[in-house]
């Protein structure tokens, strides 16, 4: 095999036009490990003799332009033989999913076949003709294989879908669902925190505390700057003191040398010269240190004044803000008290009568059966009384008939008469006998009626006692109808106009008279007393604080 190998790669579909030709010094054995997917050999750096193969889905192209033919390449083309490699089409896709090992075997088989089926041409013209014919045949076979692959894939897709749906819920899906819920919860919490911070900032803006926050931040910056200025001032003061002490020691040494000027030697002269020069340098350094110290003191004083002013301003603004909040809280407290009073009035004059009326209606419905029974018994008693009255009337009618008969007998006996005048009874005696009989019959009837009435009364008392023991909660005393406003006003007017009634009412307030109250009424009285006491205490405290505040002002 020659050093130059020309590879003609034919594109599979008809839409992929052109062939790729590359010249390289690499042998063909390096192309044996290419996968059976569509291979796109992209050649970059042809001039450097390097070869790079890149895998693309269904397209073969060169990333760079092919190099121009050099005289050496032209000589190689004329003298050497060129080998043309045609990439075979991939086999049709199988329904079963191939494993990684089988994929490697198919790849090596396809590569070996491509090497064995590689024809050799004697000339460049025959190579081009055979490549064109193979391009057309390869395109047709590739289109057929692609259609078969598409059909097979479409047939296997429903089976895979059915297998997916038949599988139970996997832990991965549960974990993904939990991850989505966790992400959603995190998003909700982040939004909540953002809204909370926004609401806090809005509240600060409305109440005017944002300006105080700015003053606090500015004071913090001034405090940091003031600390730095103090450190610079300490350094400048220490530098000034050290330079001053050094110059003083130098001046003392110079004075000592001048005192024994007559006994100087060359070393003393040299020392004096150096000390004099050092004194001049120290003088300049001391002047500069004094200037730096003055600037540091000025800066520290300015920052200290600014910091004190900022602290005073913050205190003043916070005092005003606290007074405003206190004033608003006072109005809010009064508003809450007003709402409580309004609720109390609504409960007492609207809700409580409605509830009482509803309760009475419920009690009336519950006692309707008992009242019907009582009415039935009263009707029976009335019928019994009416029946006894009819019996008494019939008895009186019977007695009147007997009296008429007796009168008739008496008249007949008086008309016939006893000739002796003493053998028969007189009319007065007969009337007395009749009256005695009538009185005896009337007494017997009255005794019977009294006994019957007493028995009925005892039965009614027993029934009432039984009802009282059975339903003590549902029985209530009959309530009098509520008085109107006019009647109440008249009653109060009469009570106030009469001193005796006023005295009796006052004495009755602390008397030992027993009254019956419900627990609900006692609770309402306690709540009313507590509300009244709280209102009185709050009013007194408000007026005291207001008077103290006005006194301080």
Swiss-Prot record:
Residues 103-116 have a biased composition (Basic and acidic residues). Keywords: Coiled coil, Membrane, Mitochondrion, Mitochondrion inner membrane, Transit peptide, Transmembrane, Transmembrane helix. Residues 352-523 are mitochondrial intermembrane. The keyword Disulfide bond does not apply. It is a multi-pass membrane protein. Residues 545-553 are mitochondrial matrix. The chain crosses the membrane at residues 331-351, 524-544. Residues 62-84 have a biased composition (Polar residues). GO terms for biological process: inner mitochondrial membrane organization. Residues 133-160, 443-473, 484-495 have a biased composition (Low complexity). Residues 210-241, 277-309 form a coiled coil. Residues 61-174, 408-428, 443-497 are annotated as: Disordered. Pfam families: She9_MDM33 (PF05546). It is found in: Mitochondrion inner membrane. It comes from the Eukaryota. GO terms for cellular component: mitochondrial inner membrane. Belongs to the SHE9 family. Required for the maintenance of the structure of the mitochondrial inner membrane. Involved in mitochondrial morphology. Causes growth arrest when highly overexpressed. Homooligomer. This is Sensitive to high expression protein 9 homolog, mitochondrial.
């Amino acid at each position: 095999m020659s050093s130059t190998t020309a590879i003609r790669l034919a594109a599979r579909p008809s839409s992929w036009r052109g062939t790729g030709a590359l010249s390289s010094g690499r042998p063909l054995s390096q192309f044996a490990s290419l996968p059976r997917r569509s291979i796109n050999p992209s050649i970059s750096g042809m001039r450097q003799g390097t070869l790079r193969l890149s895998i693309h889905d269904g397209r073969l192209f060169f990333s760079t332009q092919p190099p121009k033919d050099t005289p050496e390449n032209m000589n190689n083309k004329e003298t050497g033989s060129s080998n043309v490699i045609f990439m075979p089409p991939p086999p049709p896709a199988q329904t079963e999913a191939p494993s990684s090992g089988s994929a490697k075997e198919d790849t090596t088989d396809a590569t070996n076949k491509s090497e064995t089926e590689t024809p050799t041409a004697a000339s460049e013209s025959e190579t081009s003709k055979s490549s064109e014919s193979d391009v057309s045949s390869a395109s047709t076979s590739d289109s057929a294989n692609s259609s078969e692959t598409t059909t097979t894939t479409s047939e296997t897709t429903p089976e895979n879908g059915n297998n997916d749906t038949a599988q139970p819920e996997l832990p991965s899906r549960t974990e993904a669902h939990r991850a989505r819920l966790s992400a959603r919860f995190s998003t909700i919490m982040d939004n909540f925190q953002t809204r909370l911070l926004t609401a806090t900032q809005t509240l600060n803006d409305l109440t005017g505390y944002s300006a105080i926050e700015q003053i606090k931040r500015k004071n913090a910056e001034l405090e940091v700057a003031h600390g730095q200025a103090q450190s610079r001032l300490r350094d400048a003061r220490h530098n000034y003191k050290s330079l001053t002490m050094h110059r003083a020691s130098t001046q003392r040494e110079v004075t000592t040398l001048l005192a024994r000027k007559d006994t100087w030697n060359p070393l003393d002269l040299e020392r004096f010269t150096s000390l004099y020069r050092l004194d001049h340098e120290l003088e300049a350094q001391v002047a500069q240190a004094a200037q730096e110290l003055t600037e540091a003191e000025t800066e520290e004083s300015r920052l200290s004044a600014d910091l004190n002013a900022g602290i005073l301003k913050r205190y003043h603004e916070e005092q005003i803000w606290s007074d405003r909040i206190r004033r608003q809280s006072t109005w809010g407290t009064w508003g809450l008290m007003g709402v409580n009073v309004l609720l109390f009035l609504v409960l007492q004059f609207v809700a409580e009568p409605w509830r009482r009326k509803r309760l009475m209606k419920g009690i009336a419905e519950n006692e309707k059966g008992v009242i019907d029974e009582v009415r039935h018994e009263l009707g029976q008693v009335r019928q019994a009384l009416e029946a006894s009255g009819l019996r008494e009337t019939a008895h009186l009618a019977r007695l009147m008939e007997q009296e008429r008969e007796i009168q008739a007998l008496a008249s007949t006996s008086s008309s016939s008469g006893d000739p002796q005048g003493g053998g028969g009874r007189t009319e007065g005696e007969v009337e007395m006998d009749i009256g005695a009989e009538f009185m005896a019959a009337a007494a017997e009837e009255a005794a019977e009626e009294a006994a019957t009435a007493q028995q009925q009364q005892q039965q009614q008392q027993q029934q009432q006692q039984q009802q009282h023991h059975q339903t003590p909660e549902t029985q209530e005393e009959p309530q009098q109808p509520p008085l109107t406003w006019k009647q109440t006003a008249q009653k109060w007017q009469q009570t106030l106009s009469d001193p005796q009634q006023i005295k009796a009412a006052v004495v009755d307030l602390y008397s030992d008279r027993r009254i019956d109250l419900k627990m609900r009424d006692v609770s309402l009285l306690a709540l009313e007393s507590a509300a009244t006491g709280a209102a009185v205490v709050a009013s007194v405290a408000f007026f005291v604080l207001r008077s103290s505040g006005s006194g301080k002002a």
